[in-house]
């Protein structure tokens, strides 16, 4: 069955830019339909659907050098093709930027994950990819119920982290922090969740904002080359994803995630901008209240809350760009099956 759809596998065929990937459809012995739409895009339709069937986008490779999710996704697809992995949900698997992965780079011209807002952007390789991804989402979510839509966008962090895995929950105008989504997070042993406080330009935000999808950006470990990822540290996530796709009840126990709210965004305003810590500082490094950790022009950058922590710091961003997120731990609860915090 694999040979009738892929020469090697979904991942490695997608990365073989010298050979075309022709759109085609096959059906497994289990009745699962596999539709290869284009390079890096595979739709999987279960043999039977019902009112509870999810319509899930599972994407990776938005940044070309974040390869651990690619390896996991390739294994899931291999096992779906062979019949080893049961399928109960309709899935759209996406390898977003094969050209960047082949070059072992994050992106070629622009950061793809900053191109999903409604602002005008300079034409580029990545802008064309973003436009194509928007079309794919529109087609995949067409004629589906909002409650059935999920989008898990899988990444790896550039730097080390106090939390090996963490999720970013986008801020959208729809209720996109469902109890079932958060239960999946705990089942996957994702160590922390960041609750965004403002709209953004990411792929997962776009799904949440425009399609009311239960969407997350998931950071799974640290950037490494293909074949060099520590996948054993993502075993619970792997198992939880397989249970999610098959709609099986998990056999392993969940683990509570640490919850953070984004307290503020640090935007670079001056040429004279720097942090006081080294480039290898870990995500979620916390500061004491009033502790100065950098400057922007004449203004010191300091922690405004005890234990306020920094995530995604980048001293080299252009003026006007986000240089870091600041987060604080928060207690959460559910209202109408949606996660909220006080």
From Swiss-Prot:
This is Succinylglutamate desuccinylase. Transmembrane segments: none annotated. It comes from Vibrio cholerae serotype O1 (strain ATCC 39541 / Classical Ogawa 395 / O395). GO terms for biological process: arginine catabolic process to glutamate; arginine catabolic process to succinate. Its EC number is 3.5.1.96. It catalyses: N-succinyl-L-glutamate + H2O = L-glutamate + succinate. The gene is astE. Keywords: Arginine metabolism, Hydrolase, Metal-binding, Zinc. Pathway: Amino-acid degradation; L-arginine degradation via AST pathway; L-glutamate and succinate from L-arginine: step 5/5.
């Amino acid at each position: 069955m694999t040979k009738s759809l892929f020469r090697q596998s979904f991942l490695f065929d997608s990365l073989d830019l010298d050979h075309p990937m022709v759109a085609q459809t096959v059906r497994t012995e289990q009745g699962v339909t596999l539709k290869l739409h284009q390079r890096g895009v595979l739709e999987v339709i279960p043999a039977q659907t019902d009112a509870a069937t999810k319509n899930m986008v599972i994407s990776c490779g938005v940044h070309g050098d974040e390869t651990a999710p690619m390896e996991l996704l390739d294994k899931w697809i291999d096992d779906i093709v062979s019949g080893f992995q049961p399928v109960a949900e309709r899935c759209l698997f996406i390898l977003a930027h094969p050209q960047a992965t082949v070059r072992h780079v994050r992106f070629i011209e622009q950061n793809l994950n900053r191109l999903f807002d409604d602002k005008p952007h300079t034409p580029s390789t990545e802008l064309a990819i973003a436009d194509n991804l928007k079309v794919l989402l529109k087609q995949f979510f067409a004629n589906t119920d909002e409650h059935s839509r999920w989008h898990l966008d899988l990444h790896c962090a550039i730097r080390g982290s106090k939390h090996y895995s963490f999720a970013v929950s986008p801020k959208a105008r729809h209720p996109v922090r469902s109890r079932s989504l958060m239960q999946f997070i705990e089942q996957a042993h994702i160590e922390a969740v960041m609750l965004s406080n403002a709209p953004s330009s990411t792929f997962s935000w776009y799904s949440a904002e425009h399609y009311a999808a239960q969407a997350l950006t998931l950071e799974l470990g640290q950037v490494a080359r293909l074949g060099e990822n520590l996948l054993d540290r993502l075993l619970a996530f792997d198992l939880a994803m397989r249970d999610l796709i098959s709609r099986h009840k998990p056999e392993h126990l969940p683990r509570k995630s640490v919850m953070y709210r984004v307290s503020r965004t640090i935007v670079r305003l001056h040429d004279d901008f720097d942090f006081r810590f080294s480039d290898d500082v870990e995500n979620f490094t916390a500061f004491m209240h009033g502790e100065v950790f950098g400057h922007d022009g004449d203004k010191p950058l300091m922690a405004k809350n005890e234990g306020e922590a920094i995530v995604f710091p980048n001293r080299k961003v252009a003026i006007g760009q986000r240089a870091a997120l600041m987060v604080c731990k928060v207690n959460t609860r559910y209202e109408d099956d949606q996660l909220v915090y006080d």
